[in-house]
C-alpha cells in the first residue's frame, strides 16, 4: 500500500505521518513552498522526520501563492494572542484571518492528489484536525468529504484523502503522537516544527505565535514532557 503524507513538519502532520507508518503504508512525504516565513525550518523538520520514517521526501514549489497572499505567514506580520484567547472564538477567528493563505489547502491537496495518482498511491494523509477546524473552514469534516467527492471526478484511481486526527484536539494529538512513537520505537515529535517564524536555529520556536501557544498547551494538557525549545517559555 502506498500513501502520500502532506508533511509541513508541524505537530499535526508529524503525528499523521506516524499514523500512516503505523498502518504499514509505504510513505512518500511532500512539503509545500508557498513563500512562508518558516519555510527553511519546515523543510529541515520534514526532511528529518521523513528520514526517520524511511520515506521519500519532496519539496513542491507553489511560491506563486505569495503573489496574491496577504497572510502573515507570507508577510511576517504574525499575531501574538494571549493564552486565554485560544478558546475565544471571536479572537481566534480574527487571528485565523490574519494568517489565512488563500485556498492554500485546496491547492496543496489537489497537487498531492495528482502526485498520489501518478505514483499509484491510494491515500493522501493530511493533518486536518478538530481544534483548527473550529476556525479554519478547510480543516472541517465537511471540507474532507467534499474534497473527496471532487476526487471521484478528478482522478482515475479514485485516490482518497484521509485525516486520522479530524476528531482530535491538540492535546489528544500530542498524546497519540507519543503513543505511536512508543509503538514504533521512533522519535519524531522533538523534530517537529510548529512555529510561524524562522528563529534562526533548528527546531527553535518563538513561543508567542498562536501555533506555538497551541503546541505548548497541547503537551502540557496531555501530561507529556514538551521536547520543544522556545525563545519565550
UniProtKB/Swiss-Prot annotation:
Disulfide bonds: none
Listed pathway(s): Purine metabolism; 7-cyano-7-deazaguanine biosynthesis
Required cofactor names: Zn(2+)
Enzyme Commission number(s): 6.3.4.20
Binding residue positions for Zn(2+): 195, 206, 209, 212
Keyword list, A-Z: ATP-binding, Ligase, Metal-binding, Nucleotide-binding, Zinc
Keyword DNA repair (UniProt): no
Catalysed reaction equations from the record: 7-carboxy-7-deazaguanine + NH4(+) + ATP = 7-cyano-7-deazaguanine + ADP + phosphate + H2O + H(+)
InterPro entries referenced in this protein's UniProt entry, alphabetically: QueC (IPR018317), Rossmann-like_a/b/a_fold (IPR014729)
Cofactor detail note: Binds 1 zinc ion per subunit.
Annotated ATP binding sites: 7-17
Gene Ontology molecular-function annotations: ATP binding; ligase activity, forming carbon-nitrogen bonds; zinc ion binding
UniProt KW Ligase keyword: yes
Function as written in the Swiss-Prot or TrEMBL entry: Catalyzes the ATP-dependent conversion of 7-carboxy-7-deazaguanine (CDG) to 7-cyano-7-deazaguanine (preQ(0)).
Family (UniProt): Belongs to the QueC family.
Entry-linked NCBIfam families: 7-cyano-7-deazaguanine synthase QueC (TIGR00364)
UniProt-listed HAMAP family: QueC
Name this polypeptide is given: 7-cyano-7-deazaguanine synthase
Naturally occurring in which organism (per UniProt): Methanococcus maripaludis (strain C7 / ATCC BAA-1331)
